[in-house]
């Protein structure tokens, strides 16, 4: 059993696994080299050999406990027929959502379009040390709907009136997305993934009266599916803050990933019967070595004697110095 799996499932606090969101990314010169030759991000995600190579890059530099497959949460909307492009300074841009075309999707076509991802997982698993975990991931239904419907986020706020769709239509689309996310998870597990992380990046924008319908229930259904398939599941509902307590009680993830706005002391005292992950602000890594290690130690000591995975409160930023990340990884691995 890998260190990560032992921590998540057995709630073993005796050692602290370490990995990072976006650990295979733009802060690494070897990634930038591949990216410079592959301008189309979606095509890069669908290149099984390159995807696997990128996935393994950080493990060649750092003593990490897990690889996370190089892909994107928007590969599911792509598999469901929407065009997905990443424009400089604008981020992801999707073609207009067409309800009729959305419901014309079938499992075989969806799986065929995303098959290179599953091949990349198979290749990565073959080249990954047996003591390392292989994490696959999905975007939560609410977060995907924001992109699929083309909703604009302004100053971390969203106007649900701009959904321009009936509540019934949103509900039907949510259920359909859940179905295809479970198909995607199942295929990733069969390919060799041994852990799943669910990114609900925009959970914090959901109004209180809709939090159960748009966040808790969709995540609960997917977590239930993961547990039925005996796969450890990590949830990252960004922006929930103290609503994380309700999330844990209702959704019952094996592990909850904390964002950088969540007070770690509050999390330690209020989130029970769940492994915790992350929390440290990625911008801490822009500071000097002494300050970086001081904050690393703070998180390690706050969660001492709790099942805890060291990570950040969001993905690694492109400006991150790999040398500083190396120092953090060594600090975690030497923590007693």
Predicted regions and their residues:
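Glycine-rich, proline-tolerant flexible connector loops at the mouths of alpha/beta enzymes
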Residues: 68-85, 98, 103-110, 193-211, ...
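A short acidic, glycine/proline-enriched capping/turn motif at secondary-structure boundaries
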Residues: 73-76, 91-92, 141-143
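Short, basic, glycine/proline-bearing loop/turn elements
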Residues: 33-45, 99-110, 249
